[in-house]
């Protein structure tokens, strides 16, 4: 394991609590190799203000966020009134959608859990470009570039974010430190709970830009945090993807690494 102090200035703002130290654990690469995947995993421990990754260079490289952007999109929607509250029902118009689980009325939590793209495209259109740009700037979210269309800039447009920036944003959300109401931050945090056991709770969101090609692969994400006792572990995973069959690797690799670190059960 080697310390990569030079990356601190590159990937974190000085005010970020998780910027005290960054180290590389190259042993994690075996999990990527075993599944023939090229990617990165970042794990940050709140109590020690430290982060570990298998690839510091890739961790500071920005990629399109895809559906991980549903986290800030939901918060911005709540802040602007595009989403009234967590009980608002987003009506299905009866038209066929890309995925069957999207073809029903959904509330906020349900829309996030099934990653309903049409719902969040509707939210983004109601927020509008001016307010969307304002909040991405306030959140220091990636490059904050909404070029490419108000309802698709995070799917196929110009928005980019690194794994390090993802954990920075998630830490701010966890601490209710984003420039948004505490009540709305709590709503979003509850909406992204994906696993709850007696030992730990996982808040997370996946993302997937599409497979791309071998020469220009797409990107698959899994980001979130684990609350375990008094400790909080923030994580961000991304990988190149040129075959949809590899999509499960985003969770399986992350789970194996976190299990090896004694954080969750699995692997």
Swiss-Prot record:
E.C. code: 3.5.2.6
Tagged with keyword DNA damage: no
Catalytic function, reaction form: a beta-lactam + H2O = a substituted beta-amino acid
Positions annotated as active site in the UniProt record: 67 (acyl-ester intermediate)
Transmembrane segments: none
Biological processes, Gene Ontology terms: antibiotic catabolic process; cell wall organization; response to antibiotic
Gene3D superfamilies assigned to the protein according to its UniProt record, in alphabetical order: DD-peptidase/beta-lactamase superfamily
Positions annotated to bind substrate: 205-207
Keywords, in A-Z order: Antibiotic resistance, Hydrolase, Plasmid, Signal
Activity regulation comment: Inhibited by clavulanic acid.
Alphabetical list of InterPro entries matching this protein: Bact_Transpept/Beta-Lactamase, Beta-lactam/transpept-like, Beta-lactam_class-D_AS, PCN-bd_Tpept
Secretion signal span: 1-19
Disulfide bonds listed in the record: none
One CC-aspect GO term: plasma membrane
Group of enzyme by EC: hydrolase
Gene Ontology molecular function: beta-lactamase activity; penicillin binding
PANTHER family hit by this protein: BETA-LACTAMASE YBXI-RELATED, PEPTIDOGLYCAN D,D-TRANSPEPTIDASE
Stated role: Hydrolyzes both oxacillin and methicillin.
Recorded family membership: Belongs to the class-D beta-lactamase family.
Protein name: Beta-lactamase OXA-5
Organism, scientific name: Pseudomonas aeruginosa
